[in-house]
Amino acid sequence: MVKIVFWDNCLNERGTTTTLFNYAYYNKTILGNESIIMYNTSRTDNINEVIDLFKKEFKVIGVNNFKLVDTILHKLKCDIFYITKAGENEGQISKVCKTVVHCVFHCNQPHGNVYAGISQFIKGDKKRVPIVPYMINLPEYNKNMREELNIPEDAVVYGRYGGYDAFDINYVHKIVYDVAKQNPKIYFIFMNTQQFCGSLPNIIHIEKTIDVNRKVEFINTCDAMLHARHIGESFGLAIAEFSTKNKPIITTPNFKLNPKVDIAHIHFLKEKGIWYNESNLYNILTTFITEENKEEISKKDWNAFKDYTPEKVINQFKKVFID
């Protein structure tokens, strides 16, 4: 049995924490190894409910200074220290055990014993680094929020969740407001999303959740996901979660706004993506899904992430980080 300490700078609702939980959980349940969680207690963006969720499954250790990490790793007789990073070598590695670095945004500064990326589409010299992708494992759950939110069953609903400030393309904000104002039977629901326009009854904001059933309930409420992140995605966990629940993803390649955009969402979705720009978004939101074609749209295959199951990904995790 291998003992792995998983480090996260903070434990919150973001995708990096979600994926760290998944790696640690399936390292324990599928691979039969020991998973221990360590995090920085001084971060103000830690969320107590998330920390409690980790404590139900793992031993959790908080430290207020990274310099304390090696002393704890030595005492624990740890075999591997796993850490997620943007990609920079900022000095956060262990000197007492094998350090495996998992890069989220780029892979330009190799360091540690293993240096890997989250997708083959992140920036940097990807030919030199192995890839361990995110895994998608939302539960089967059939409820939705339409009754709770007073949304008619025949209404068209677009939604998104993700980083609070990551729905940030200005022209999308304006078009969403215009569509909602002129089409009262088209709804937009936003979870954990910064408010960006005036109030309308069919633009609904919902607080973040760490309950995966609640997350699926939110996805089930939507007919499609509307994605609008100006820097693109180096993987796109929220996109993947909507996609595995067979929801169309309405998004943009976005090269005009940002020539250095991350392009993972473009490569993953391919022909399954519904691609917008400023000139066609209004038309897409008002004609792509209608009351008349909703059922037909829902029967099509929109899942672009069939290969990212826990069983497949954790074996890649083992191959790259453990073996």
Stretch-by-stretch model annotation:
Residues 248-258:
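Short hydrophobic beta-strand element within catalytic cores of glycosyltransferases
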Residues 8-14, 21-68, 194-196:
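N-terminal strand-loop element at the rim of the active site
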Residues 134-199, 205, 212:
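Conserved catalytic-core segment of nucleotide-activated headgroup transferases in glycan assembly
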Residues 106-107, 113-142:
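Donor nucleotide-sugar binding/catalytic pocket of nucleotide-sugar-dependent glycosyltransferases
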Residues 15, 279, 290-322:
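A charged, aromatic-enriched C-terminal amphipathic alpha-helix characteristic of glycosyltransferases
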Residues 216, 239-244, 258:
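Short alpha-helical segment that forms part of, or immediately flanks, the ligand-binding pocket
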Residues 78, 217-234, 247-248:
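Acidic donor-binding loop of glycosyltransferase active sites
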